[in-house]
Amino acid sequence: MNRLGGGKKGKAMGTFAIGGSSGFAIGPLFAGSIAYTVGPHGLAAFTIVGLIISTVLFVLMPCIVTQARTIDQAVAMENPTLVAKPLKNYWKYFGILFIIILSQSVNFRVINAFIPIFWTRELGTSPEQGSFALTIFFSIGIFMTYIGGLLGDKYGPIKIIRLSLLIWLPAMFLLTEVPTFSPVIMMPIAYMLLLMIGAAKALSYSPVIVLGQTYLAKSIGFASGITLGVSQTIGGIIAPVVGNLADTYSLPAAMMTLVPFLVVGLGASLILKDPKKLQ
């Protein structure tokens, strides 16, 4: 995607991420429907779909590689001086970016795990409403990942990452306080804050990946492994700790421990530097 994006890497990554966001939002609905109507063995249908998509990608991959080379040549002709510069890795700033990735991953994975429980246990809703809240949380990401990519191309990825954290931090703090609100406004505010958190996470998805690949221009594969792979899993390590805190104290109190991670992430974003100024 880095090569296919040409000069619009954020837009390309945002388009690519729509597929993943759609899968997170729609997948559980399909899986639940199949499991309830056909039975657990019906989930084998996902294996068939995976095989079909893998076959299509295998057939089309030579065309994709050819297209990437064509785009590389076009970029080289338009920016001969840029291409002539040797590629460099800026590990210091990638390390700072990793702090942001960690703070976002911890919050996203824990929220993902505890939204249904928070809705049912703390807000007094039905399990169905808890699942619906989770679907809303993922659905907003389908649109905001693409918008985040466009904004990253226009204003630069660092500004969008900062904007994302500026939205996410207060929304996360207020969400933990929602159970103390009046019942009349409790649910509307809860859904509004949930949308803000989902939008904030998705908004910075493409800019984080693009910025990571730019900081490690000589090691794009490694950068992709961190920004695309580790970012999706490392937060899950903290989830059991938060769950234990929820059992010991309360779920809102446990979720409040996520706020300092966002504070650190926001602070780290303020010392990031534009890769263009480092060259």
Model-predicted segments: where are they?
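Helix-to-loop junctions at the C-terminal end of transmembrane segments
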Residues: 145-156, 246-247
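A late C-terminal transmembrane helix in Major Facilitator Superfamily
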Residues: 218-248
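C-terminal transmembrane helical hairpin of 12-TM major facilitator-type secondary transporters
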Residues: 157-208
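Extracytoplasmic gate region of multi-pass secondary transporters
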Residues: 92-135
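Flexible cytoplasmic inter-helical loops of multi-pass small-molecule transporters
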Residues: 59-83, 279
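Intracellular juxtamembrane helix-capping segments at the cytosolic ends
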Residues: 1-5, 203-216
